[in-house]
Amino acid sequence: MVGYSDLKGNPLWVVYKLTPPQENAPHLKRPDNFSADWRNLGLITSTDYTNSGYDRGHMAPNHAIALLYGKEAQQETFLMTNITPQRASLNQKIWQRLEEIELESFAPKFKVLWVYTGPLFDLKTTHLKSSYFVDIPNAFYKIYVGLEASGAIKVLAFIVPQNAKANDRLQKYLVSIDEVERRSGFDFLHQLDDKIEDALEKEIDTTSWF
């Protein structure tokens, strides 16, 4: 599920569900091309990123979605409405590491793992030199909501800046969900009871995760 902004040329939030991957799940070939999304009024295309100095960064990850949901779902991760500008040093290093950990380490700990992710912007934003219609985020967030077999809910959140170093420890970028909400303007766990929501959103507890 994607919440897309035509004004920023970015997905503002993306939600996907992870479950423990099956050992015999097929590893699908990565699609060759990114595709424009006809629902996008600005019709951002892959060429908007050409020679921009930024990678076409997936929010819903190609590998995990392909592994769990198959080829058609994988191809949807290559729609430009799932793509945001990421520095190569982020996209191909620490962000990729976080995507690997969420699938291989976090998901097996829970019955179901929900992931909320998206870009964060400064008040004064710049756009790609190759496209006036695509704003450049200064950071990205990930919120994990894990449902245990007992029914207990565990949460974890990160904000990772564009200039994060490849060998940084992920724990360096741990934040509360409250902090993600403050910077994004979104209310992520509003469907929960208010007391439970308040308690989960202010905590930074890695006990069930690392």
What are these language model-derived features?
Residues 38-210:
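Domain-level detector of nuclease and nuclease-like folds
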Residues 1-56:
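Short, His- and charge-rich active-site/binding loops that engage polyanionic ligands
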